[in-house]
């Protein structure tokens, strides 16, 4: 059984660990950037909205990237333009409101102002814990962020962490060096 599972996993890796996969997946958004902060922010937002139909996710991601971020996620967060969405309860994407987006941006703003990048912020948020536990401790108060008791929400955040931490893939970035892939 173990060998059969290993072979199946290797076949899946061969299918999805290719550059062609990027075009039709939410990971395309952070792949548009080269700056660490832009990759982190774009990746976190892309994983946050990764609920539902892939085409709808990509359409919404494009809207965020082009209309809100103006292709500069880090600059957008530091500009504080997102503050205008405080208390706005209308729909941002599916079951997320504009106020949810505001809270996410506010948390990202604090992370970048205090530590310069999200990786460092997570390292300082708790003295110990897995990357997922650290991510949850910082972003868990936001609608749609990981509740460690919810496998579906944790799955999205594990996807984001894999993108940032895993180093042996053309799909993933491996830009976070303070965490080891074994911790995923």
Spans of features found by a protein language model:
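HhH-family (HhH-GPD) DNA N-glycosylase catalytic core used in base-excision repair
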Residues: 1-184
């Amino acid at each position: 059984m173990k060998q059969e599972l290993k072979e199946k996993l290797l076949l899946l890796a061969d299918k999805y660990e290719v550059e062609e996969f990027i075009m039709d997946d939410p990971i395309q958004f952070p792949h548009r950037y080269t700056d660490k902060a832009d990759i982190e922010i774009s990746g976190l937002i892309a994983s946050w909205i990764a609920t539902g139909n892939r085409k709808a996710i990509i359409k919404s991601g494009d809207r965020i990237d082009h209309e809100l971020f103006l292709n500069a996620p880090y600059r957008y967060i530091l500009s504080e333009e997102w503050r205008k969405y405080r208390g706005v309860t209308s729909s941002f994407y599916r079951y997320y409101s504009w106020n949810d987006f505001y809270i996410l941006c506010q948390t990202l703003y604090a992370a970048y102002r205090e530590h310069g990048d999200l990786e460092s912020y997570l390292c300082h948020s708790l003295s110990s814990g897995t990357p997922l536990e650290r991510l949850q401790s910082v972003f868990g108060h936001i609608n749609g962020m990981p509740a460690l008791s919810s496998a579906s929400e944790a799955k999205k955040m594990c996807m984001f962490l894999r993108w940032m931490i895993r180093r042996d893939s053309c799909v993933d970035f491996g830009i976070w060096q303070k965490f080891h892939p074994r911790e995923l």
